[in-house]
């Protein structure tokens, strides 16, 4: 399904569910509240916004939704859960939004999801990948656009099992997404390779990585392979420091999200070769 078709269908459903019938016939726009980390994660959020704007243009050129134009109100939450919830409340109660979309970081997405479930607002989570978003912490009002972390970690576990590696080290941001990603990989890999060993687990703060210290810790554990969940600026620092110190030489690396253009392109000439990525 094309993004514009999906977006139109979702906005249509939300408008019918949340807008009084008397208001459906009005001429004003159907408003969607979009919350994201536009400054903090500009390399990802910028193209993401441009894609939405293109889809909105196509939808409105085709007659809009319920014969009304579709309008997005974009807000920056600075990557802070509390700020995101505050903005969500304002969008729904003051701006007249019929639904919420957005978020990249899982801790922010979980905060919006909890708020949406409590208030009965439809929330389309664009990028938060923590499995708990739609599993343990899920609710009937929250939907996710992306494939799950469980699925992507499972694919990498299959590749890791086929590599013949037995000793693994992991590095992941210490918040919900990173924790879910490591847990899913370990479960999937041990089901395929029962004698696999995890010799190190590194948990840098998200966007606060001390790459030198993390590389040293990984090297000391002498793994056969590394499972990486860092992304964005943390990934860039890890790749640079690990490359300079030879961490990846002769080792398999299995890495979540690192093949996506938003995270791969900024690495430029430092982009690692031979990694298995999603």
What annotation goes with each model-predicted range?
Residues 91, 95-104, 124-126, 169-172, ...:
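Periplasmic-binding protein-like
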Residues 86, 131-132, 139-245:
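Extracellular/periplasmic Venus flytrap/periplasmic-binding protein
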Residues 3-13:
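N-terminal export leaders
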């Amino acid at each position: 399904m094309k993004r514009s078709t999906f977006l139109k269908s979702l906005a249509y459903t939300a408008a019918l569910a949340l807008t009084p019938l008397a208001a459906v016939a009005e001429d004003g726009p159907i408003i969607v509240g979009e919350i994201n980390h536009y400054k903090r994660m500009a390399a990802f959020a910028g193209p993401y916004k441009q894609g939405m704007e293109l889809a909105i243009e196509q939808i409105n050129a085709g007659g809009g939704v319920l014969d009304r134009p579709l309008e997005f109100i974009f807000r920056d939450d600075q990557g802070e859960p509390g700020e995101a919830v505050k903005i969500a409340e304002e969008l729904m109660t003051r701006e007249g939004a019929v639904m919420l979309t957005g978020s990249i970081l899982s801790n922010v997405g979980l905060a919006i999801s909890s708020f949406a479930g409590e208030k009965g607002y439809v929330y389309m989570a664009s990028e938060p990948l923590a499995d708990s978003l739609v599993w343990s912490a899920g609710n009937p009002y929250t939907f996710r656009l992306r494939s799950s972390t469980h699925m992507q970690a499972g694919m990498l576990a299959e590749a890791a099992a086929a590599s013949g590696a037995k000793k693994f080290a992991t590095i992941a941001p210490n918040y919900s997404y990173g924790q879910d990603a490591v847990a899913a990989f370990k479960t999937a890999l041990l089901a395929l390779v029962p004698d696999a060993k995890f010799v190190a687990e590194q948990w840098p703060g998200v966007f606060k990585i001390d790459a030198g210290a993390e590389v040293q810790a990984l090297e000391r554990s002498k793994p056969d392979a590394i499972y990486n969940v860092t992304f964005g600026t943390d990934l860039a620092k890890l790749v640079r420091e690990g490359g300079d110190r030879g961490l990846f030489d002769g080792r398999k690396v299995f890495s979540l999200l690192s093949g996506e253009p938003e995270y791969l392109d900024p690495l430029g000439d430092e982009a690692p070769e031979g990694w298995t990525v999603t």
